[in-house]
């Protein structure tokens, strides 16, 4: 008889212990159900990157002294720096700077070791494209145009297409009364 009572008491203890474990498991489940979802609907909602996020590199043309430190510290020798030596002022003049983000590993060495701080990491992470050649960013795509943009051969033809509001002085280096390539809105007739 004592054997049966012992079995019943063991069964009751086991049932209570099983209910306790099930209750603990359900409490964890309900805690997770009450939390906000971590998943975001990416194209419509975007998470804000952290302060030190290493995204696309921003380049400032005017600060660069063409020292090529960025090329030497890059593990894959990625930045392409084209420069000429100006004998009059005895300094290097930067002609072209480009980085191929299809190859870049975003280590940040170029930004860290740049002596003039002309390189900086942005929070931009959307670099996807259908053509890998679109990921090769030149000095204009990496940042802003140089101060002497009126002497840039790539920008000069585009400047002639610009329209100036009434009363504004003519653009630099254009003769007065020169024809624009396009028509003003009031010159267009249906």
Swiss-Prot record:
Residues of the signal peptide: none
Catalytic activity: a plastoquinone + NADH + (n+1) H(+)(in) = a plastoquinol + NAD(+) + n H(+)(out); a plastoquinone + NADPH + (n+1) H(+)(in) = a plastoquinol + NADP(+) + n H(+)(out)
Keywords: 4Fe-4S, Iron, Iron-sulfur, Membrane, Metal-binding, NAD, NADP, Plastoquinone, Quinone, Repeat, Thylakoid, Translocase
Ranges where the record places region Disordered: 169-190
UniProt GO BP: photosynthesis, light reaction
Gene3D superfamilies noted in UniProt: 3.30.70.3270
GO cellular component term, pick one: plasma membrane-derived thylakoid membrane
Cofactor note: Binds 2 [4Fe-4S] clusters per subunit.
Subcellular localization: Cellular thylakoid membrane
Domain 4Fe-4S ferredoxin-type: 55-84, 95-124
InterPro entries in UniProt: 4Fe4S_Fe-S-bd (IPR017896), 4Fe4S_Fe_S_CS (IPR017900), NADH_quinone_OxRdtase_chainI (IPR010226), NDHI (IPR004497)
Residues bound to [4Fe-4S] cluster 2: 74, 104, 107, 110
Record GO terms (molecular function): 4 iron, 4 sulfur cluster binding; iron ion binding; NADH dehydrogenase (ubiquinone) activity; quinone binding
Positions with a binding annotation for [4Fe-4S] cluster 1: 64, 67, 70, 114
Quaternary structure annotation from Swiss-Prot or TrEMBL: NDH-1 is composed of at least 11 different subunits.
Functional summary from the UniProt entry: NDH-1 shuttles electrons from an unknown electron donor, via FMN and iron-sulfur (Fe-S) centers, to quinones in the respiratory and/or the photosynthetic chain. The immediate electron acceptor for the enzyme in this species is believed to be plastoquinone. Couples the redox reaction to proton translocation, and thus conserves the redox energy in a proton gradient.
Protein name, as recorded: NAD(P)H-quinone oxidoreductase subunit I
